[in-house]
Protein backbone atom coordinates (compact mmCIF):
# COMPACT_ATOMS: atom_id res chain seq x y z
CA UNK A 1 0.00 0.00 0.00
CA UNK A 2 0.93 3.69 0.06
CA UNK A 3 0.78 6.19 2.94
CA UNK A 4 -0.36 3.49 5.32
CA UNK A 5 -2.95 1.99 2.95
CA UNK A 6 -3.03 -1.80 2.58
CA UNK A 7 -4.84 -3.03 -0.53
CA UNK A 8 -5.87 -6.68 -0.80
CA UNK A 9 -7.31 -8.03 -4.06
CA UNK A 10 -8.73 -11.55 -4.37
CA UNK A 11 -11.40 -13.37 -6.40
CA UNK A 12 -14.92 -13.85 -5.19
CA UNK A 13 -15.84 -17.39 -4.15
CA UNK A 14 -18.95 -19.25 -3.03
CA UNK A 15 -21.07 -19.13 -6.17
CA UNK A 16 -24.79 -19.46 -5.58
CA UNK A 17 -26.83 -22.26 -7.11
CA UNK A 18 -28.95 -19.80 -9.09
CA UNK A 19 -26.13 -17.90 -10.76
CA UNK A 20 -22.38 -17.60 -10.86
CA UNK A 21 -22.28 -14.86 -8.22
CA UNK A 22 -19.58 -15.11 -5.57
CA UNK A 23 -20.74 -13.95 -2.16
CA UNK A 24 -17.42 -14.36 -0.33
CA UNK A 25 -13.76 -13.48 -0.91
CA UNK A 26 -10.77 -15.84 -1.01
CA UNK A 27 -8.97 -14.05 1.83
CA UNK A 28 -8.32 -15.40 5.32
CA UNK A 29 -8.94 -13.34 8.44
CA UNK A 30 -6.51 -10.46 8.78
CA UNK A 31 -3.68 -10.73 11.29
CA UNK A 32 -3.95 -8.82 14.54
CA UNK A 33 -1.76 -5.81 15.32
CA UNK A 34 -1.13 -4.46 11.83
CA UNK A 35 1.14 -1.60 12.82
CA UNK A 36 1.32 1.48 10.63
CA UNK A 37 -1.79 0.61 8.62
CA UNK A 38 -4.18 3.53 8.40
CA UNK A 39 -6.69 2.00 5.99
CA UNK A 40 -7.32 -1.48 4.56
CA UNK A 41 -9.18 -1.89 1.27
CA UNK A 42 -10.26 -5.44 0.41
CA UNK A 43 -11.49 -5.99 -3.15
CA UNK A 44 -13.44 -9.11 -4.06
CA UNK A 45 -13.38 -9.24 -7.84
CA UNK A 46 -15.29 -11.27 -10.40
CA UNK A 47 -13.88 -12.00 -13.86
CA UNK A 48 -15.99 -11.70 -16.99
CA UNK A 49 -13.82 -13.41 -19.58
CA UNK A 50 -14.07 -13.94 -23.31
CA UNK A 51 -12.00 -15.52 -26.05
CA UNK A 52 -13.63 -13.30 -28.67
CA UNK A 53 -13.94 -9.59 -29.33
CA UNK A 54 -16.15 -8.12 -26.59
CA UNK A 55 -18.54 -5.18 -26.55
CA UNK A 56 -19.38 -3.69 -23.17
CA UNK A 57 -22.99 -2.61 -23.68
CA UNK A 58 -25.96 -1.87 -21.44
CA UNK A 59 -26.89 -5.56 -21.22
CA UNK A 60 -23.48 -6.60 -19.86
CA UNK A 61 -23.36 -3.56 -17.56
CA UNK A 62 -26.76 -4.49 -16.13
CA UNK A 63 -25.59 -8.05 -15.45
CA UNK A 64 -22.46 -6.80 -13.70
CA UNK A 65 -24.41 -4.34 -11.55
CA UNK A 66 -26.81 -7.12 -10.54
CA UNK A 67 -23.88 -9.37 -9.56
CA UNK A 68 -22.29 -6.57 -7.53
CA UNK A 69 -25.55 -5.98 -5.67
CA UNK A 70 -25.83 -9.70 -4.90
CA UNK A 71 -22.24 -9.73 -3.62
CA UNK A 72 -22.89 -6.86 -1.20
CA UNK A 73 -26.39 -7.99 -0.26
CA UNK A 74 -29.45 -5.89 0.47
CA UNK A 75 -28.36 -3.10 2.78
CA UNK A 76 -24.79 -4.43 2.59
CA UNK A 77 -25.35 -7.38 4.93
CA UNK A 78 -23.10 -9.74 2.95
CA UNK A 79 -20.20 -7.32 2.72
CA UNK A 80 -20.70 -6.58 6.43
CA UNK A 81 -20.44 -10.32 7.15
CA UNK A 82 -17.21 -10.52 5.16
CA UNK A 83 -15.85 -7.54 7.09
CA UNK A 84 -16.70 -9.19 10.42
CA UNK A 85 -14.91 -12.39 9.37
CA UNK A 86 -11.83 -10.56 8.13
CA UNK A 87 -11.45 -8.55 11.35
CA UNK A 88 -12.30 -11.38 13.77
CA UNK A 89 -8.70 -11.51 15.04
CA UNK A 90 -8.62 -7.79 15.83
CA UNK A 91 -11.91 -5.93 16.17
CA UNK A 92 -10.07 -2.60 16.12
CA UNK A 93 -9.40 -3.13 12.41
CA UNK A 94 -13.10 -2.95 11.54
CA UNK A 95 -13.20 0.85 11.48
CA UNK A 96 -10.19 0.94 9.15
CA UNK A 97 -11.27 -1.82 6.76
CA UNK A 98 -13.63 -1.66 3.80
CA UNK A 99 -14.91 -4.39 1.46
CA UNK A 100 -15.36 -3.46 -2.19
CA UNK A 101 -16.83 -5.21 -5.20
CA UNK A 102 -14.33 -5.54 -8.02
CA UNK A 103 -15.01 -6.20 -11.70
CA UNK A 104 -12.45 -7.50 -14.19
CA UNK A 105 -13.28 -7.70 -17.89
CA UNK A 106 -10.85 -9.84 -19.88
CA UNK A 107 -10.63 -10.71 -23.55
CA UNK A 108 -8.01 -12.40 -25.69
CA UNK A 109 -9.24 -10.14 -28.50
CA UNK A 110 -10.47 -6.56 -28.57
CA UNK A 111 -12.75 -4.87 -26.04
CA UNK A 112 -14.98 -1.95 -27.00
CA UNK A 113 -16.79 -0.03 -24.27
CA UNK A 114 -19.77 1.23 -26.27
CA UNK A 115 -22.26 2.27 -23.56
CA UNK A 116 -21.85 5.01 -20.96
CA UNK A 117 -21.18 3.51 -17.53
CA UNK A 118 -21.49 5.21 -14.16
CA UNK A 119 -20.05 2.91 -11.50
CA UNK A 120 -22.11 4.70 -8.85
CA UNK A 121 -25.65 6.04 -8.96
CA UNK A 122 -27.65 8.46 -6.86
CA UNK A 123 -30.78 7.79 -4.84
CA UNK A 124 -33.82 10.08 -4.67
CA UNK A 125 -32.15 12.14 -1.92
CA UNK A 126 -29.09 12.81 -4.04
CA UNK A 127 -26.82 10.50 -2.03
CA UNK A 128 -24.40 8.08 -3.65
CA UNK A 129 -25.77 4.55 -3.96
CA UNK A 130 -23.01 1.92 -4.07
CA UNK A 131 -22.90 -1.84 -3.34
CA UNK A 132 -22.33 -2.09 0.40
CA UNK A 133 -21.75 1.66 0.48
CA UNK A 134 -18.30 1.27 -1.13
CA UNK A 135 -16.86 2.19 -4.54
CA UNK A 136 -16.66 -0.46 -7.27
CA UNK A 137 -13.18 -1.11 -8.69
CA UNK A 138 -13.06 -1.73 -12.44
CA UNK A 139 -10.27 -3.44 -14.37
CA UNK A 140 -10.50 -3.89 -18.15
CA UNK A 141 -7.81 -6.03 -19.80
CA UNK A 142 -7.81 -6.55 -23.57
CA UNK A 143 -5.04 -8.69 -25.00
CA UNK A 144 -5.40 -6.66 -28.19
CA UNK A 145 -7.07 -3.25 -28.48
CA UNK A 146 -9.17 -1.56 -25.79
CA UNK A 147 -11.43 1.20 -27.10
CA UNK A 148 -13.42 3.41 -24.73
CA UNK A 149 -16.02 5.00 -27.01
CA UNK A 150 -18.48 6.00 -24.26
CA UNK A 151 -18.03 7.87 -21.00
CA UNK A 152 -16.94 6.07 -17.85
CA UNK A 153 -17.31 7.66 -14.41
CA UNK A 154 -17.64 6.96 -10.72
CA UNK A 155 -20.60 8.77 -9.22
CA UNK A 156 -20.46 12.06 -11.12
CA UNK A 157 -23.83 13.21 -12.36
CA UNK A 158 -24.67 13.54 -16.02
CA UNK A 159 -24.93 17.23 -16.84
CA UNK A 160 -28.45 16.73 -18.23
CA UNK A 161 -29.80 15.47 -14.88
CA UNK A 162 -32.42 17.44 -12.91
CA UNK A 163 -31.05 20.57 -11.28
CA UNK A 164 -33.15 19.92 -8.16
CA UNK A 165 -31.24 16.73 -7.33
CA UNK A 166 -28.03 18.11 -5.88
CA UNK A 167 -25.79 15.43 -4.41
CA UNK A 168 -24.75 16.25 -0.84
CA UNK A 169 -21.77 13.93 -1.15
CA UNK A 170 -18.34 15.51 -1.52
CA UNK A 171 -15.40 13.90 -3.28
CA UNK A 172 -13.14 12.56 -0.54
CA UNK A 173 -9.62 11.26 -1.12
CA UNK A 174 -9.55 7.49 -0.88
CA UNK A 175 -13.24 6.86 -1.47
CA UNK A 176 -13.34 6.77 -5.27
CA UNK A 177 -13.20 3.76 -7.56
CA UNK A 178 -9.95 2.40 -8.96
CA UNK A 179 -10.03 2.28 -12.78
CA UNK A 180 -7.49 0.14 -14.66
CA UNK A 181 -7.72 0.23 -18.47
CA UNK A 182 -5.16 -1.92 -20.29
CA UNK A 183 -4.67 -2.57 -24.00
CA UNK A 184 -2.14 -5.21 -25.03
CA UNK A 185 -2.65 -6.86 -21.66
CA UNK A 186 -0.64 -9.87 -20.55
CA UNK A 187 -3.53 -12.01 -19.33
CA UNK A 188 -1.16 -14.62 -17.90
CA UNK A 189 0.33 -12.12 -15.44
CA UNK A 190 -0.83 -11.67 -11.86
CA UNK A 191 -0.29 -7.93 -12.20
CA UNK A 192 -3.49 -6.54 -13.76
CA UNK A 193 -1.49 -3.72 -15.38
CA UNK A 194 1.05 -6.00 -17.08
CA UNK A 195 1.34 -5.72 -20.87
CA UNK A 196 2.80 -7.99 -23.54
CA UNK A 197 6.29 -7.06 -24.67
CA UNK A 198 6.32 -6.58 -28.45
CA UNK A 199 8.75 -8.62 -30.51
CA UNK A 200 10.56 -5.55 -31.84
CA UNK A 201 9.95 -3.26 -28.86
CA UNK A 202 8.24 -0.82 -31.23
CA UNK A 203 4.86 -2.17 -32.31
CA UNK A 204 2.61 -2.73 -29.28
CA UNK A 205 0.52 -5.88 -28.91
CA UNK A 206 -2.52 -3.67 -28.43
CA UNK A 207 -3.59 -0.09 -27.89
CA UNK A 208 -5.77 1.89 -25.49
CA UNK A 209 -7.96 4.44 -27.28
CA UNK A 210 -10.28 6.81 -25.44
CA UNK A 211 -12.81 8.78 -27.52
CA UNK A 212 -14.54 8.68 -30.88
CA UNK A 213 -15.23 11.18 -33.64
CA UNK A 214 -17.73 13.98 -32.95
CA UNK A 215 -18.57 12.63 -29.49
CA UNK A 216 -17.53 13.73 -26.02
CA UNK A 217 -16.08 10.76 -24.15
CA UNK A 218 -15.05 11.40 -20.56
CA UNK A 219 -13.28 9.05 -18.15
CA UNK A 220 -13.41 10.49 -14.62
Predicted features along the sequence, with ranges:
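Extracellular and secretory-pathway beta-repeat/beta-biased strand scaffolds
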Residues: 1-220
Amino acid sequence: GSAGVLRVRAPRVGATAAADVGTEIAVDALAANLDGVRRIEVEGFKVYGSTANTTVNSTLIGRIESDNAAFAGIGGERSDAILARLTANDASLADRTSVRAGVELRSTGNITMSSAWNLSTFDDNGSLARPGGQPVNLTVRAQRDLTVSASLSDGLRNSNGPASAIAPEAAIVGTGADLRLVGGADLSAADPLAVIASADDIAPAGNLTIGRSNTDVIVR
